[in-house]
């Protein structure tokens, strides 16, 4: 498992398919896969969970191999793309939970350090997403606003 504030990656995780071709045993057409992605998104699953469900339950190794589109591209075409990217939202949820913990345990210094590292990462990601046009330029992170939303 990697550390949150280091630039190295962890060693655990599933191995991506070796070939970039559609497996011969796959019985789903690109339209079927897109329909499944949209259906799962409407049921409230995040893009990463959609990929896991398609891999584990439907045997679809990679959506991009089959459809030539990423899951978020399919969701964007159908108007289902989340306003805030999934990785940023996960960090915001983590920061909200740490703040909630610190309200009950104000002397927990390791939690304070964790909050500092998490919020630093949030600010770096927001800067990146503004630069690439994913988030609007007037987007700001305020812990109070997101504490109510989550």
Swiss-Prot record:
Classification of source organism: Archaea, Thermoproteota, Thermoprotei, Thermoproteales, Thermoproteaceae
InterPro entries assigned: Ribosomal_uS15, Ribosomal_uS15_arc_euk, Ribosomal_uS15_N, uS15_NS1_RNA-bd_sf
Pfam families (UniProt xref): Ribosomal_S13_N, Ribosomal_S15
Gene Ontology cellular-component terms listed: cytosolic small ribosomal subunit
Region (Disordered): 1-21
Protein name: Small ribosomal subunit protein uS15
Compositionally biased region (Basic residues): 1-10
The species this protein was found in: Caldivirga maquilingensis (strain ATCC 700844 / DSM 13496 / JCM 10307 / IC-167)
PROSITE patterns: RIBOSOMAL_S15
One GO term of the biological process aspect: translation
Membership in a protein family: Belongs to the universal ribosomal protein uS15 family.
Any one GO molecular-function label of the UniProt entry: structural constituent of ribosome
Superkingdom of origin: Archaea
Assembly and oligomerization: Part of the 30S ribosomal subunit.
Keywords: Ribonucleoprotein, Ribosomal protein
């Amino acid at each position: 498992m990697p550390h949150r504030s280091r630039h190295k990656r962890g060693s655990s995780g599933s191995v991506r398919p070796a070939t970039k071709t559609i497996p011969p045993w796959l019985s789903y057409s690109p339209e079927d896969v897109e329909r499944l992605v949209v259906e799962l998104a409407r049921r409230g699953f995040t893009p990463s969970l959609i990929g896991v469900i398609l891999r584990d339950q439907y045997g679809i190794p990679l959506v991009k191999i089959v459809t030539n589109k990423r899951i978020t591209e399919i969701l964007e075409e159908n108007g289902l793309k989340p306003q805030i990217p999934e990785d940023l939202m996960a960090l915001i949820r983590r920061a909200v939970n740490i703040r909630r913990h610190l309200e009950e345990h104000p002397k927990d210094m390791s939690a304070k350090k964790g909050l500092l590292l998490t919020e630093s990462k949030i600010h770096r990601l927001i800067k990146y997403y503004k630069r690439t046009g994913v988030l609007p330029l007037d987007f700001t992170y305020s812990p109070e606003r997101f504490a109510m939303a989550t």
